[in-house]
Amino acid sequence: MAIYKITPEKDATLYTEYPSMNTGIDAILEASTYLKDSNAQTSRYLIKFSQTEINNIFDTHISNSTTNVVRNHSFCLRNYAATVTGLNKDSKLEAYAISGSWDMGTGRFGNDPETTNGCSWVFTDESGSVKWKQSNWATFVTASFEDKLKGGGTWFTGSATGLVVSASQTFNYTDPIDLNLDVTNICNLWVSQSKSI
């Protein structure tokens, strides 16, 4: 079985603690929950891969449209930990397909002044322009529900096919800490929808 590796064309981390801060060109992606001054804080990250690159791999190596044969395949999301601190006995990381477009921006964590020219916890793109939708989503789409933390993206939680469109990995402090998620259902649905299959 051949292995094809692709890298994201854009990514960014969203922070509740810094609701308008953009981190689009920061080298680190962060997923965490923590307390700051007795307030719960969250960070999550967005990753986008080239649809053209995904479709090319699918069309060239997985699916044959002439014979309607689809080869056995799987898609995995791999992220490698730079630093891990404060792990609970068990920690769970979940991945969902994002619903809607977003702008990566050019910010880095800790820029002073704060960079706001891309997505953040509150905004999908340049700060002050378009907020993440908080209601009236499309079918199978949701977002954060906490009133104090409005924002943080919108994502798919299901599909008309009934396939599970999320992935998760549970870590404990003795496990390897690199992320390795099976995102086959997410990718197959994404490809089929992008091609109107």
Positions of predicted regions on the chain:
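Secreted, disulfide-rich extracellular signaling modules
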Residues: M1-I197
